Structure formats: C-alpha cells, structure tokens
C-alpha cells in the first residue's frame, strides 16, 4: 500500500469532537424511540470499512442514503442484492454500457466490488429517516464528511473525484486540483442525467488517469460476493 495511514489514524480526533458525538447521540436516540433509520447502525460507516484511506483511488460523492426499506447499506448509490436498482444507478449503468467495451448491465445494484478496488462511495450525510429524504441533513454529518474530503485531499495524491450535481461540486470545492483529478457532470438522476451525465465518459476518464499513474484501473462491472450469488 502506498499510504499506510488508516481512517482510524486520521479520524480518531474528529470522532471525539462534540458535534460528532451529538450526531451519533441524536441518531441513537431516534432509533431507541422507535424511528426507523437507514442504513442499519452496523452499516453506517461501511464506506470506510470497505475502502481504507490508503487504498482510495476514486471518490464518488452521493448525498443522502436511500430512504426506502432495505436499500441503504452505507455505500453511496449502492443497494443490497435483491433490491430493485434505483434510477440514478440505472443511469450510471447506462453510461457504463455506452462507454466501457463489454460492459453489460448487471441484475443487481450492489457496488461492494467497486469499494474493494478503492472506490470510496461516500454519501455526504450518513443516515436518514425512513421515507423522509434529507431528514438528517442538518445533524452534523456534513461537517464530518467535509473533514473526510479534506483528509483525502491532504494525505493522498492522484485521487479521481467524480462530482455529479451541484451538491457534490460544492462539497468538492476544497479539493486541490494540482494534487488530484476532479471530474464534474450533472447528477445521474433521471431529472438531470440528460443534461450532460450521459456522455460525460467519467468511468473511462478515471481509468485512463489511474493507468497514466501506473495504477490498476477499476473493473466497473459490479460483481456479487460469493456468499450473495
């Protein structure tokens, strides 16, 4: 590994900050009072569990976790096996079909295989109430994920940031474009995909950048883990 620093090394202090402890306490209190919160507690930090800091090659920023039953599991845009593929992810698959030779759309939306290759699938807010989009947007998660982005910016070099939509682009404004490769496009949502997400070629461009740096490109074909097949 090129960079031995771990998330634990760089985030331990942040996780002791009063705002962060308040965020965790608010989420825990809501769960205890019977409110359904997504993703389940054990999955909230999966993006960091599956993609260690030293392994990050690509960052894809999402916004809110999915707020439907069984969808969110801690990786932006991804859903568990057996759950219908959400519209934004379907549009990502369409872009992949149109630009990556041999890519065929999978019958699932589970992106763990991307995460295991170094694609940090980071939502900027890490929890949500069932059926209530953006219900946890002001809890403090944004402060935490701002810190995460600044730490990647500081401790890594040559990371590709895929910033889709105005929210991600504002969030990524701090990224040093001399150190990293920033690609911007409209969001893959059906509301905006036809305004320039389709044809943005980001998946190809990300791999070209990685190859130029002598790194292994991402295999964008999502593969289910053996236990899910």
From Swiss-Prot:
Q: Which residues form a coiled coil?
A: none
**Subcellular localization(s) per the UniProt record:** Cytoplasm
What are the protein's UniProt keywords? Answer: Cytoplasm, DNA damage, DNA repair, Hydrolase
The Gene Ontology terms for molecular function here are: uracil DNA N-glycosylase activity
Catalysis: reaction(s): Hydrolyzes single-stranded DNA or mismatched double-stranded DNA and polynucleotides, releasing free uracil
The top EC class is: hydrolase
Q: What is its main location?
A: cytoplasm
Indicate the family of this protein: Belongs to the uracil-DNA glycosylase (UDG) superfamily. UNG family.
Q: What is this protein called?
A: Uracil-DNA glycosylase
Organism name: Shigella flexneri serotype 5b (strain 8401)
Q: Gene symbol?
A: ung
């Amino acid at each position: 590994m090129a960079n031995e620093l771990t998330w634990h090394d760089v985030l331990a202090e942040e996780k002791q900050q009063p705002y962060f402890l308040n965020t965790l306490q608010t989420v825990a209190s809501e769960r205890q009072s019977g409110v359904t919160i997504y993703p389940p507690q054990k999955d909230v930090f999966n993006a960091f569990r599956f993609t260690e800091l030293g392994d990050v090659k690509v960052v894809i920023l999402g916004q809110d976790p999915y707020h439907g039953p069984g969808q969110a599991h801690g990786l932006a845009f991804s859903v568990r096996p057996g759950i219908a593929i959400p519209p934004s992810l379907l549009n990502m698959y369409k872009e992949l079909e149109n630009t990556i030779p041999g890519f065929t759309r999978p019958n699932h939306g589970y992106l763990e295989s991307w995460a295991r290759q170094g694609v940090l699938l980071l939502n900027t807010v890490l929890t949500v109430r069932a059926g209530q989009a953006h219900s946890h947007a002001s809890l403090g998660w944004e402060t935490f994920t701002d810190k995460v982005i600044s730490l990647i910016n500081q401790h890594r070099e040559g990371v590709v940031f895929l910033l889709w939509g105005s929210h991600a682009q504002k969030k990524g404004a701090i990224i040093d474009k001399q150190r990293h490769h920033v690609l911007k496009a409209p969001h893959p949502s059906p509301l905006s995909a036809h305004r320039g997400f389709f044809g943005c070629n980001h998946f190809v461009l990300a791999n070209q950048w990685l190859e130029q740096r002598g790194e292994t490109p991402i295999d964008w074909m999502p593969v289910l883990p053996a236990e899910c097949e």
